[in-house]
């Protein structure tokens, strides 16, 4: 994903991937009807981060699970500030340590929130 985003100008994710095998070349093959930014894809990076960081919010239960986070290879540290979970805002720090990604709860604002961090 990072390699694909870095090849486009301005840097961004492609609107779609067609499923053909990857071939060597200077950049991904452009597909004119899909290579213009479209609003439906604007949330792709947030969904990517949610999956990579293992964020599973349960707002009605006042709970946030962080399950086996994994930072991508190009990123050694990431801080997520004031992430909304129901009426609460949570700040988390993720840091690579060897092959593992560690998660640290830095703070909770607003309503009550239980944060469960499960590392592999």
Please report, for each region that a protein language model flagged, where it lies by residue:
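Non-catalytic C-terminal accessory modules of carbohydrate-active enzymes
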Residues: 1-120
């Amino acid at each position: 994903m990072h390699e694909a985003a870095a090849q486009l100008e301005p840097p961004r994710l492609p609107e779609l991937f067609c499923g053909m095998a990857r071939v060597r070349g200077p950049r991904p093959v452009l597909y004119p009807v899909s290579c213009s930014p479209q609003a439906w894809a604007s949330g792709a990076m947030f969904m990517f981060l949610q999956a990579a960081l293992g964020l599973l919010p349960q707002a009605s239960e006042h709970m946030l699970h962080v399950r086996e986070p994994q930072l991508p290879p190009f990123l050694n540290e990431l801080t997520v500030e004031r992430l909304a979970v129901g009426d609460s805002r949570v700040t988390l720090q993720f840091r690579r340590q060897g092959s593992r990604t560690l998660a640290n709860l830095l703070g909770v604002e607003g309503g009550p929130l239980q944060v469960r961090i499960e590392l592999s």
